[in-house]
A protein has these predicted regions:
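Short, charged, amphipathic alpha-helix that recurs within catalytic cores of restriction-modification
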Residues: 128-141
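Short beta-strand-loop-alpha-helix junction that forms the active-site gateway
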Residues: 118-125
């Protein structure tokens, strides 16, 4: 497991980036080739542009940010006063599940918390749902809010939410299953599954080096 990009070890426990859930949702074998086997291929134009846009949005928010407060303070104050608060680029970590990442936006409302992940499209693919659900799980474990949590996917460009669901038992069980499977990949106690969809293989940037490609 040494040298795996993005993997951090805290008190002997592996922690991997929550964004890996998105990759696993597309193709677990792709995740395995990139992160575990450390096979390098060029980034796509979409990936490069997406990273630039994300950095610009983060910079814009930081320039406009006015009042600083902790999550705990925002949760307490919203309950007491009925105010709502918006937090961008919130770093989160779950020591229980061994995951970490940065949440695009957290909306703290008097009766609920909304965890938002910004994406370039409008389709709620399973990998995206699992990624934002993992952010919700990590937030729940770290801050233990006294209200319901909702997971939401939002179009990065027009700011319209195209998927929104209460973080319930079904989402929790679904994402925990994938988290445990990734930890098993890291520990080399299970072999990854590959996609059976040729269309995914055609879109995959690893198709020329993948020994399971159907393209």
């Amino acid at each position: 497991m040494n040298g795996i990009d993005g993997l951090i070890v805290i008190n002997g426990i592996n922690h991997f980036p929550i964004s890996w859930l998105h990759s696993k949702g597309f193709c677990e074998y792709q995740l395995y080739l990139e992160k575990i086997k450390k096979i390098k291929v060029e980034k796509t134009t979409e990936m490069i542009i997406g990273k630039q846009i994300h950095a610009e949005l983060e910079k814009e928010f930081l320039e406009q940010a006015e009042e600083e407060m902790t999550i705990e303070e925002a949760l307490s104050r919203s309950k007491e006063t009925g105010e709502s608060f918006l937090i961008r680029e919130l770093e989160t970590i779950s020591r229980k599940y061994g995951i970490y990442g940065k949440i695009d936006e957290v909306q703290i409302l008097p009766e609920s918390v909304v965890i938002i992940d910004d994406k370039p499209g409008n389709v709620a693919y399973q990998g995206l749902i699992k990624q934002v659900s993992a952010y919700s799980l990590s937030f729940l474990e770290e801050f233990k809010p006294d209200r319901e949590i909702f997971s939401a996917l939002r179009n990065r460009d027009n700011k319209e939410v195209f998927w929104n669901q209460k973080f319930d038992k079904n989402l929790l069980e679904m994402v925990v299953k994938d988290i445990l499977e990734i930890h098993d990949l890291i520990r080399d106690v299970r072999f990854p599954e590959s996609s059976t969809n040729p269309q995914k293989c055609l879109k995959c940037r690893f198709r020329k080096v993948c020994d399971r490609s159907l393209a």
